[in-house]
Amino acid sequence: MAQITLRGNAINTVGELPAVGSPAPAFTLTGGDLGVISSDQFRGKSVLLNIFPSVDTPVCATSVRTFDERAAASGATVLCVSKDLPFAQKRFCGAEGTENVMPASAFRDSFGEDYGVTIADGPMAGLLARAIVVIGADGNVAYTELVPEIAQEPNYEAALAALGA
């Protein structure tokens, strides 16, 4: 269990992020078309998981926009993962014109538990904590960041550097 804060108030996650150097947990997420997004699709490629509570909050929306801009320049593969319904993610990305990130919903799978990012208590219980996981082309975790305060943005530069972007 990891501890983070929401506006200074301590809350917990259900576990810990996977360790750097360990095999990344397999995942199955849902895309905006309700199709399956599987970790198998990215074998042999590096991928950045931008994990957050909801696209309908300002900091989360900023992270999607920022990674969209940065991914365009680098050609990086970025999945934006939240518990939002795929319809909400698709609406947001359509309205924002994002084209370089892939929205991926964890609304019906064990992603949050497998990656240790489901919030266990407090007003956001059940949603995902703000975190970054970079999975290398070898399938191992290359970088992680559990953002200590949900209202803060992740370290974009460190995440993209770990991705090699």
Curated annotation (Swiss-Prot):
Cellular component, GO annotation: cytosol; extracellular region; peptidoglycan-based cell wall
Pfam families tied to this protein: Redoxin (PF08534)
Phylogenetic placement of the source organism: Bacteria, Bacillati, Actinomycetota, Actinomycetes, Mycobacteriales
Residues of the Thioredoxin domain: 18-165
Family the entry assigns: Belongs to the peroxiredoxin family. Tpx subfamily.
InterPro entries: Redoxin, Thioredoxin-like_sf, Thioredoxin_domain, TPX, Tpx_CS, Tpx_Peroxidase_subfamily
Self-association and partners: Homodimer.
Miscellaneous field: The active site is a conserved redox-active cysteine residue, the peroxidatic cysteine (C(P)), which makes the nucleophilic attack on the peroxide substrate. The peroxide oxidizes the C(P)-SH to cysteine sulfenic acid (C(P)-SOH), which then reacts with another cysteine residue, the resolving cysteine (C(R)), to form a disulfide bridge. The disulfide is subsequently reduced by an appropriate electron donor to complete the catalytic cycle. In this atypical 2-Cys peroxiredoxin, C(R) is present in the same subunit to form an intramolecular disulfide.
EC number(s) per entry: 1.11.1.24
UniProt-recorded name of the protein: Thiol peroxidase
CDD domains named among the record's database cross-references: PRX_Atyp2cys (cd03014)
Function: Thiol-specific peroxidase that catalyzes the reduction of hydrogen peroxide and organic hydroperoxides to water and alcohols, respectively. Plays a role in cell protection against oxidative stress by detoxifying peroxides.
Enzyme class: oxidoreductase
Keywords, ordered alphabetically: Antioxidant, Disulfide bond, Oxidoreductase, Peroxidase, Redox-active center
SS bond list: 60-93
Catalytic activity field: a hydroperoxide + [thioredoxin]-dithiol = an alcohol + [thioredoxin]-disulfide + H2O
